[in-house]
Structures are given as structure tokens and as C-alpha cells.
Amino acid sequence: MPWLLSAPKLVPAVANVRGLSGCMLCSQRRYSLQPVPERRIPNRYLGQPSPFTHPHLLRPGEVTPGLSQVEYALRRHKLMSLIQKEAQGQSGTDQTVVVLSNPTYYMSNDIPYTFHQDNNFLYLCGFQEPDSILVLQSLPGKQLPSHKAILFVPRRDPSRELWDGPRSGTDGAIALTGVDEAYTLEEFQHLLPKMKAETNMVWYDWMRPSHAQLHSDYMQPLTEAKAKSKNKVRGVQQLIQRLRLIKSPAEIERMQIAGKLTSQAFIETMFTSKAPVEEAFLYAKFEFECRARGADILAYPPVVAGGNRSNTLHYVKNNQLIKDGEMVLLDGGCESSCYVSDITRTWPVNGRFTAPQAELYEAVLEIQRDCLALCFPGTSLENIYSMMLTLIGQKLKDLGIMKNIKENNAFKAARKYCPHHVGHYLGMDVHDTPDMPRSLPLQPGMVITIEPGIYIPEDDKDAPEKFRGLGVRIEDDVVVTQDSPLILSADCPKEMNDIEQICSQAS
């Protein structure tokens, strides 16, 4: 390949310009699937934890906690296998994948938000610095999925590192992630002429770029130029999402950790919910308990909704007082080592369900148990959703909430009291792989949520007065297996007796 550098060489930026424009292929290097064992992590701080600086978090060979260089290389290999199938019959002999990192976002002048990497970029390489580009390039004379992986990263800059902390640089990026080559970000421009060639098919998400500035500087001109050729730029996000949909054993282990620590945070939050209690206090308690147990951040702003506010599905103000006799609905999760949890529990803040609360809660719990039993290969989230609506319709009749409803209107009535779906895919994102339809047959390794609810606003004149103002949702995280479903949130209490026992010990 004209611009290929032999992998072991990491030379100054000026020399690298020549390397990208023309150099011999290093035939001794086995690209892509196996990282180079002799590359040692620099004995300095990088732009993210490494086995050298954070041995309490990462073992040797890991890029992120629990995920090795080999795991990341295998993901890239699988992506190029998908591209090989997609590219059959298309013109163009070369294939190039471009994935941008996220930028740093700012809440106000000089005040950044906590950086969060683009999850497609992170999934393929594990590199956690902003302003970076991952390129996967097919190799001349070799069939896909053979390829090389290249990272373009911010150059080391002592003046910026004084303020913002260390950067990995090219040597750190290549040693930590196990990619084949690494260069400074500015050198990416030397790849553009080759990618513009008629023989090169480029895979890049130009419709939804994750980094507006890098898109404007580099990829927008390329996309516009190739729009006039036979080989237009093709999106890659759906292919990556197809891979992300099925979790590896290492990913499931990460999600088990997130589920366990979130479950413990729920228990500790229940312990402290003595009425009256502020929603803001429960919010703070939940976040503290997640972080104290090793979570990096909360996965999303939690819903901490007392009383009638539980009927606002995405209530996140969390600034009211929960009164004695009211329930609280807490929908919360954390992110731990790049993977998230998403759990919902509803409980009485005074430690005792009233009779109407218990009736409604037990109805939702029975529906949830029945839905969990359907989480096996071959069914789908859409199938489970239909069953949930049927079950809700029957429970609404049993509770006297839905009267004189004909069978053909039962679904519509059920949707009134549960206007959301039964669940969604879960992984690196809360609403993971959003382009993947819920009608897909479930497969072992998929992770989903099951979260039925019944919500009865206080002004609903159709419902019996005793139920008005009550909202209940129960949500668990589930791994689909060949056998029975694996409940990642099994440690989080949901039986009424267990909840009352915990809440009775509130301090």
C-alpha cells in the first residue's frame, strides 16, 4: 500500500508525512487480529488508565477494564467481515472505514462537561481521548477481513497537558490499544487523496457525524467529492450496531458488575427513604452509592418521582418532597467500565404499602414475571410487548380500572395506562443500538430491559379513586441465554415483603 508504514516504527511527525504518502508494506507484520506482544505500555500517565498506572483497574493486555486488546481486535475483524459481505458485487477494490471520536463539549466558557467517548469509536478500539480518528483499511493483495487499524490522536503538547492532563500520544495509543499504527491527528489529511480514488469505497456516517469539527475539516469535503463518483460514501453505524447487539462473555461480565453495584445502591437508597423525604436526597444518595462502589458516572439523569409525579414517565426535576403514605418510583442506572445498567423500583417511603398500592404493585409484578419468562431465543421485544399489553388489559379489568371495554379496544386502553414499550436493548448505551428493530428474534448474548408499568394520574376520573395518583414500574436487565434468562438486576429487591423489610430499617 503506497502510504503504509511498517508497524513498529513511530517516527517524528515530519517523517510520518512521508510514510503516509508512500512506503513499502511490512510483510513480517500480522495485521489486525493479534496485537504486537513486544509493545510495552509507556511508564508514564496516559490519557486514560493503563495497566501500568492503574493496576487496580486493568490487568496486563487490557485496554479498558475486563476487555483485552484481542477482544477489540476481534471486533474490528468482525466488522470487516460484515463489510466484505456488504461490498460483494460493488465496484471498488479498497475498503476504508472511518470512525470519529467525540469532541469535548462545554457547558459554559472554559467549563467542560465530563468527557464521554462516542460508543461506536470506543467499541472498536477502546481509546478514550477526544479529537481522534480510527481508520480500518483493507490490505492490497489480501482479502477482507484482513486489514490494518490506524489511530490518529492529538499530539502531545506540554502546554496543554499542564492544564488538561496527560495525553497518550502515538506511542501510548499504539501500545495501549494494540492497533497497527498511530499518527498525530494532523496527518490524517494525507489519507484523503487515496480515499477519494474511484477504487476506494469509504464507510463513514456522514449523516450523523460524532465530531462536527473533524467532519467539517476532513470528511465533509471527501463525502461531497465522492458523491459525484460511483463509489459514494456508505454508512457504517448499522453494521457496528449489529455487532454491539450480541454481547461477548467479557461484556456480559461487565454488565453483571454494573447490575450488582446498582442493585446495592437501590438497597442503600431504600434504607434511607424515611418519610417525609426529599427527592433530591434520594437522588444524591443513589448517585453516591453507585460511585462509591466503582461506577464511573450515572448512565442517565435518574427519575426520582414521588406520589403522582411517578405518572410523568421522564420526570427528572427531582425537587419535591415525598410525603408520608406516598410511593417513590426510582428509575436509575450507572455506567461502569463502559457498560450501563437500567433498573426501576417503586416502593413506599414509609415502609408499608397501603392496600391500593399493594394491589397495583402486585399486578405490575405479576405482569413483569410473565414477561421475563418470555425472554428466550426466537421471541422478540415486539412479541413481549404485545403480551404485556394483553396482561395489562386483563389486570386493569380485574382491578376495576377498565370497565365495559370491548376486547378489540383492550390494547388501546392498556396503552393509555402504559404508554411506553416493554423494553429496549441495553449495552454501552441505555437505549442501545437504536437502529436495530425490536422485531428482531432474540438471540443468546442480547441484553434487554423488561419494564412494564401502570400509571394512573390523580385526575383520571375513569379509575377508582383509591388508585388515582399511583404509578408503578418495575424494570430488570436481562441477558438472553440458550436456557433461562440471566437477570443482571436479580440482587435488587422487588418482592413486597423484601421491600417492606428493608424500608422498615430506614434510618
Curated annotation (Swiss-Prot):
Pfam families named in the record: AMP_N, Peptidase_M24
One term of GO molecular function: metalloaminopeptidase activity
Region (Interaction with TNFRSF1B): 54-79
Enzyme class, broadest EC rank: hydrolase
Note on how the cofactor is bound: Binds 2 manganese ions per subunit.
Residues given in the record as substrate binding sites: Y300, D331, D342, H424, H431, E451, E475
Entries under InterPro entries matching the protein: Aminopep_P_N, Creatin/AminoP/Spt16_N, Creatinase/aminopeptidase-like, Pept_M24, X-Pro_dipept-like
Binding site for Mn(2+) 1: D342, H424, E451, E475
Catalytic reactions of this protein: Release of any N-terminal amino acid, including proline, that is linked to proline, even from a dipeptide or tripeptide
SUPFAM superfamilies: Creatinase/aminopeptidase, Creatinase/prolidase N-terminal domain
Annotated keywords: Aminopeptidase, Cytoplasm, Disease variant, Hydrolase, Manganese, Metal-binding, Metalloprotease, Mitochondrion, Nephronophthisis, Protease, Transit peptide
Gene3D superfamilies reported in the protein's UniProt record: Creatinase/methionine aminopeptidase superfamily, Creatinase/prolidase N-terminal domain
Superkingdom of source: Eukaryota
Coiled coil (residue ranges): none
Subunit comment: Homodimer. Isoform 1 interacts with TNFRSF1B/TNFR2 (activated) and TRAF2.
Related illness: Nephronophthisis-like nephropathy 1: An autosomal recessive disorder with features of nephronophthisis, a cystic kidney disease leading to end-stage renal failure. Nephronophthisis is histologically characterized by modifications of the tubules with thickening of the basement membrane, interstitial fibrosis and, in the advanced stages, medullary cysts. Typical clinical manifestation are chronic renal failure, anemia, polyuria, polydipsia, isosthenuria, and growth retardation. Associations with extrarenal symptoms are frequent.
The protein, known as: Xaa-Pro aminopeptidase 3
